[in-house]
From Swiss-Prot:
Transmembrane annotation, as ranges: 44-62
Gene3D superfamilies in UniProt: Cytochrome b-c1 complex subunit 8
Biological function: Component of the ubiquinol-cytochrome c oxidoreductase, a multisubunit transmembrane complex that is part of the mitochondrial electron transport chain which drives oxidative phosphorylation.
Similarity remark: Belongs to the UQCRQ/QCR8 family.
Protein name from the UniProt record: Cytochrome b-c1 complex subunit 8
């Protein structure tokens, strides 16, 4: 553990590759390829993903409406009250 920098342990069979930060581009072809690719993937998958979400939304709203309606009193029960 007490080794100094430059005299570190030798590690075998480990290969690491790196690229200088000065040679990298932050967003290469972000606007020319990235955004159109997202749109293409969305268009391809929308018919597979959207129907379950629509069904869940409709069931959720129906359930909330039924719950709110079940909390209300029935006016027919109180017609003869004075």
């Amino acid at each position: 553990m007490g080794r100094e920098f430059g005299n570190l342990a030798r590690i075998r069979h480990v290969i690491s590759y790196s690229l200088s930060p000065f040679e990298q581009r932050a967003f290469p072809s972000y606007f020319s390829k990235g955004i159109p690719n997202v749109l293409r993937r969305t268009r391809e998958r929308i018919l597979r993903v959207a129907p379950p979400f629509v069904v869940v939304y409709l069931i959720y709203t129906w359930g909330n409406q039924e719950f709110e309606q079940s909390k209300r009193k029935n006016p027919a029960m109180y017609e003869n009250d004075k």
